[in-house]
């Protein structure tokens, strides 16, 4: 029985591998990936968005029972419109990407899809967490001291 418990803990530690970025580490990464000022959205707004959507966690997921969709990754990109998880009824997959790609520690795919999302008419307002926590707020604190 003890061996099964240890095996279970080992398997659990293997499956929970999401990277949780430090604030400044994320700011520098997003800047390198071209998000600073992309479609007029400041780097501070992107970092604020990631803070409130996922807590900077690349492996965050959130199931939405109302429309049977799931939000994925550091930006909580939704499977109804943006990615394909093979489960969401009527999914559009506008980013032409597997939702699992949005859970990688390397966030290049997530950033590419976020650029696609923000290019739509709704822009960054597509994210509820941004509207609730970042819009019309002083978001400079999210990049303060980061050297970006």
UniProtKB/Swiss-Prot annotation:
Subcellular location field: Secreted
Other observations noted: Lysozyme C is capable of both hydrolysis and transglycosylation; it also shows a slight esterase activity. It acts rapidly on both peptide-substituted and unsubstituted peptidoglycan, and slowly on chitin oligosaccharides.
Keywords, ordered alphabetically: Antimicrobial, Bacteriolytic enzyme, Digestion, Disulfide bond, Glycosidase, Hydrolase, Secreted, Signal
Pfam families xrefs: Lys (PF00062)
Biological function: Lysozymes have primarily a bacteriolytic function; those in tissues and body fluids are associated with the monocyte-macrophage system and enhance the activity of immunoagents. Also plays a role in digestion in this species.
PANTHER family assigned: LYSOZYME C
Family assignment from sequence similarity: Belongs to the glycosyl hydrolase 22 family.
Annotated protein name in UniProt: Lysozyme C
One Gene Ontology MF term: lysozyme activity
SUPFAM superfamilies: Lysozyme-like
Secretion signal span: 1-18
Enzyme class: hydrolase
Complex formation: Monomer.
Known EC number: 3.2.1.17
InterPro entries to which the protein is assigned, alphabetical: Glyco_hydro_22, Glyco_hydro_22_CS, Glyco_hydro_22_lys, Lysozyme-like_dom_sf
Disulfide bonds: 24-146, 48-134, 83-99, 95-113
Catalytic activity as recorded in UniProt: Hydrolysis of (1->4)-beta-linkages between N-acetylmuramic acid and N-acetyl-D-glucosamine residues in a peptidoglycan and between N-acetyl-D-glucosamine residues in chitodextrins
Active site: 53, 71
Gene3D superfamilies to which the protein is assigned, alphabetical: 1.10.530.10
Boundaries of every C-type lysozyme domain copy: 19-148
Cellular component annotations (GO), alphabetically ordered: extracellular region
């Amino acid at each position: 029985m003890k061996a099964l418990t240890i095996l279970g803990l080992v398997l659990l530690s293997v499956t929970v591998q999401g990277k949780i970025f430090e604030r400044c580490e994320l700011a520098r990464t997003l800047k390198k990936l071209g998000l600073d000022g992309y479609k007029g959205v400041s780097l501070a707004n992107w970092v604020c968005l990631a803070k409130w959507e996922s807590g900077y966690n690349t492996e965050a997921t959130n199931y939405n029972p109302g429309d049977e969709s799931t939000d994925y990754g550091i930006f909580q990109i939704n499977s109804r419109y943006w990615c394909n998880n093979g489960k969401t009824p009527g999914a559009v997959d506008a980013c032409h990407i597997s939702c699992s790609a949005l859970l990688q520690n390397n966030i290049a795919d997530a950033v590419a899809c976020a650029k696609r999302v923000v290019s739509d008419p709704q822009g960054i307002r597509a994210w509820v967490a941004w509207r609730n926590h970042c819009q019309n707020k002083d978001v400079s604190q999210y990049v303060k001291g980061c050297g970006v």
